[in-house]
């Protein structure tokens, strides 16, 4: 691989300038080095990185005990890897984050250390690290494309030089190259000499000789083979040309360097391999990935400007099924966790009237002096009161006299129970309309003047419009359901269906808003039961990650819907479903054993956004102020969830987003970066890996719950005008970056 790249450690200064063909990146291992180009000198201290680009003049001068290392890529190697490699120009700036500098230095230190060790796997490891280094530079080091560099004033001469660098080993002629650029031979020869100070043949031979020197130094190939593979017609022609340029024969040149081998070249001056490896170890950190699997690059420039847009946070309504489930300490703990993380303050419970009617009509009579038929209900109410939760109760089949009487008994008891404490925030929710509701609401409002009424709204509601109008003064919210899975047949591959499904929730929301407008109904909306595309979750769980799709829906709904509903956990949700299709109508926050599902973290991250919108587009929103802001980036790809199971379809894609936030006030900022994607926070991905035929034991459960969290990175950065972030986005992933400027000292 020495024809492709060089790995060197230098302990001695360069006496003269050289012009680089290719790309060089390195860092100071120890001491101090001065890196010179045509116009400037850069002082580099221990750990500092330097980059020298194609055709740059350079020289380095090492101070006492100074050591540098570098990797030099040949242009032919780069041209095989990148389009327009000869125009690629890397430059480290203030926008290059400390994290990225550390990672570059880490990769180089590993690469040089591996090269010095020179064991049986060194070559393979070297090649992996070289690719990692180039990938990291492409993704994280600012770069531009220079079609004209200072060495050449004429673009066509530049093209000829690039062509020679890539094809020096072929039979090249002035005639061929003049045809390549569309000039006559004489004109090209004249322009070439004017620009470079040497003729075409001299430049071609110089290029060939420089490459031949590498082969003589680092390979055992015969001189004849080296001559032929570097563009010379014979060994004799090569020997004559080589002696003309170096004043030595190829054999003499190789004989003067018998002691230099691939691993010994690094141990120049007074340093042994072991000492160099110990010095390099100071720069080596753990690496998560060997090869970056980036498939797409995206560049985003953001400048804040005043907007009239506001982001509204949701009131979260958590369904728990039967009220008595609130007596379960695990469920209580889950509710309190939700309350802490994203301000959940409302619980929706099933109708308790059938339970009360059963007790009231029991064959034996409860002795009111020694028993309380509402004992368990009171304990549930106490929990809600203690933690400031509101209670919404779903009334169902309330058109009988027995039901209405039981309702009045229940409401009266609740009013008495809470009268000596603080008012319970109490709401009623009905999915069907009946005239008996008027009597019940009048009684309810007499005891709970601040109580609310939620009415389910759909097309069927229009048939009861007169009754709806009579109840309107008491109505606080209209409630609706929307399930994207209803819009598609998962056994088909019709893209139009999946496109329609991606808009299903927002389209139904807009339909109901229009319905309310037509009938002059002005109340906020609650989306109670809803879901994005999932398919059969028993199959797709752990494979189809959809956090970005959920966050996309929340952002679209934030100005249209006041409340969002979730089931508390998997067991409660499943126990109240008739079948799998019914289960697909809603989303739960927790799985079994208190494992938090990605939707939980989606709600948590969304809750970190503030109301003032500074910037927004199809995949990004920024909220806050210019000194304390939150950046939310997400990917939302709507496709058949079953395709996530097919490795041949490869629906998982990775995008690198280069994000610049411009015109920031200079200063030190704190960065908190949350990543939620299939690799970070996806519960079922880990669940499947640790599940056995006998289930999961406590150790496995605890481990999965500990590891199923979004990744968090925290660091400080000194910003001058621009914050540059490089974000690796996996399909349907979410990134939230909190940025806060420290006060000036």
From Swiss-Prot:
Recorded hits in Pfam families, A to Z, give: HTH_18
**Xref: Gene3D superfamilies:** Glycosidases, Glycosyl hydrolase domain, family 39, Homeodomain-like
* Keywords attached to this entry: DNA-binding, Repeat, Transcription, Transcription regulation
Q: Which SMART domains match?
A: HTH_ARAC (SM00342)
Q: Which residues form the signal peptide?
A: none
Which SUPFAM superfamilies does the entry mention?
Answer: (Trans)glycosidases, Glycosyl hydrolase domain, Homeodomain-like, Regulatory protein AraC
**Domain named HTH araC/xylS-type: which ranges?**
158-256
Ranges of the DNA-binding region feature? 175-196, 223-246
Top-level taxon of origin: Bacteria
GO molecular function terms noted in the UniProt entry: DNA-binding transcription factor activity; sequence-specific DNA binding
Q: NCBIfam families per the record?
A: TF_Staph_AryK (NF047455)
The protein's name is Uncharacterized HTH-type transcriptional regulator SA0097
Can you name the source organism? Staphylococcus aureus (strain N315)
């Amino acid at each position: 691989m020495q024809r492709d790249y060089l790995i060197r450690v230098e302990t001695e200064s360069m006496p003269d300038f050289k012009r680089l063909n290719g790309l060089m990146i390195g860092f100071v291992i120890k001491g101090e080095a001065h890196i010179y180009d045509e116009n400037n000198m850069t002082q580099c201290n221990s750990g500092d990185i330097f980059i020298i680009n194609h055709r740059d003049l350079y020289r380095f001068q090492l101070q006492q005990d100074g050591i540098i290392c570098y990797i030099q890529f040949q242009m032919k190697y780069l041209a095989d890897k990148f389009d327009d490699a000869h125009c690629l120009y890397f430059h480290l700036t203030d926008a290059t984050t400390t994290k990225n500098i550390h990672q570059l230095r880490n990769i180089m230190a590993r690469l040089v250390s591996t090269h010095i060790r020179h064991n049986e796997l060194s070559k393979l490891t070297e090649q992996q690290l070289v690719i990692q280094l180039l990938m990291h530079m492409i993704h994280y080091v600012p770069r531009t494309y220079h079609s004209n560099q200072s060495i050449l004033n004429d673009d066509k001469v530049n093209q000829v030089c690039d062509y020679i660098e890539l094809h020096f080993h072929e039979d090249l002629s002035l005639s061929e190259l003049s045809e390549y650029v569309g000039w006559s031979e004489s004109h090209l020869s004249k322009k070439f000499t004017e620009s470079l100070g040497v003729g075409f043949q001299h430049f071609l031979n110089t290029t060939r000789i420089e490459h031949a020197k590498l082969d003589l130094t680092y390979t055992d190939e015969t001189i004849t083979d080296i001559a032929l593979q570097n563009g010379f017609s014979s060994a004799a022609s090569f020997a004559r040309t080589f002696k003309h340029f170096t004043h030595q024969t190829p054999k003499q040149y190789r004989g003067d360097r018998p002691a230099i081998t691939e691993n010994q070249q690094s141990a120049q001056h007074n340093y042994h391999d072991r000492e160099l490896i110990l010095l390099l170890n100071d720069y080596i950190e753990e690496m998560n990935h060997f090869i970056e699997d980036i498939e797409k690059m995206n560049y985003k420039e953001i400048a804040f400007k005043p907007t009239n847009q506001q982001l509204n946070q949701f009131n979260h309504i958590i369904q728990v099924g039967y009220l008595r489930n609130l007596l379960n300490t695990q469920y209580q703990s889950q509710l309190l966790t939700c309350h802490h993380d994203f301000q959940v303050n409302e619980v929706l419970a099933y109708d308790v009237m059938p339970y009360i009617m059963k007790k009231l009509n029991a064959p034996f009579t409860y002795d009111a002096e020694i028993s309380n038929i509402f004992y368990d209900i009171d304990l549930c109410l106490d929990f809600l009161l203690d933690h400031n939760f509101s209670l919404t109760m779903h009334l169902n089949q309330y058109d009988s006299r027995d039901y209405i009487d039981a309702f009045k008994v229940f409401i009266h008891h609740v009013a008495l129970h809470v009268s000596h404490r603080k008012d319970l925030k109490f709401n009623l929710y009905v999915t069907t309309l009946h005239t008996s509701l008027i009597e019940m609401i009048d009684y309810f409002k007499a005891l709970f003047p601040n109580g609310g009424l939620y009415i389910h709204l759909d097309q069927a509601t229009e048939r009861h419009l007169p009754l709806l109008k009579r109840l309107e003064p008491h109505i606080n919210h209209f409630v609706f359901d929307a399930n994207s899975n209803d819009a598609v047949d998962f056994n088909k591959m019709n893209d139009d269906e999946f496109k329609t499904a991606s808009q299903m929730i927002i389209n139904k929301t807009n339909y109901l808003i229009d319905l309310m407008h037509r009938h002059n109904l002005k109340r906020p909306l609650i989306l109670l039961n809803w879901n994005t595309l999932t398919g059969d979750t028993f199959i797709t769980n752990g494979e189809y990650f959809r956090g970005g799709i959920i966050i996309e829906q929340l952002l679209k709904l934030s100005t249209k819907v006041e409340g969002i509903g979730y089931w508390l956990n998997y067991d409660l949700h499943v126990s109240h479903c008739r079948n799998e299709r019914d289960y697909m109508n809603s989303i739960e926050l927790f799985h079994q054993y208190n494992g938090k599902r990605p939707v939980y973290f989606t709600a948590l991250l969304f809750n970190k956004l503030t109301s003032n919108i500074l910037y927004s587009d199809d995949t990004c929103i920024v909220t806050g102020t210019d000194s304390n802001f939150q950046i939310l980036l997400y990917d939302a790809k709507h496709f058949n969830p079953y395709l996530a199971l097919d490795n041949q379809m490869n629906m998982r894609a990775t995008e690198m987003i280069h994000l610049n936030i411009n015109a920031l006030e200079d200063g030190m900022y704190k960065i908190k970066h949350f990543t939620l994607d299939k690799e970070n926070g996806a519960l079922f991905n880990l669940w499947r890996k640790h599940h056995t035929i006998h289930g999961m034991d406590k150790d496995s459960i605890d481990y999965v719950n500990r590891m199923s969290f979004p990744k968090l990175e925290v660091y400080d950065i000194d910003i001058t005008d621009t914050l540059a972030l490089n974000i690796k986005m996996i399909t349907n992933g979410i990134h939230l970056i909190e940025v806060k400027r420290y006060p000036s000292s």
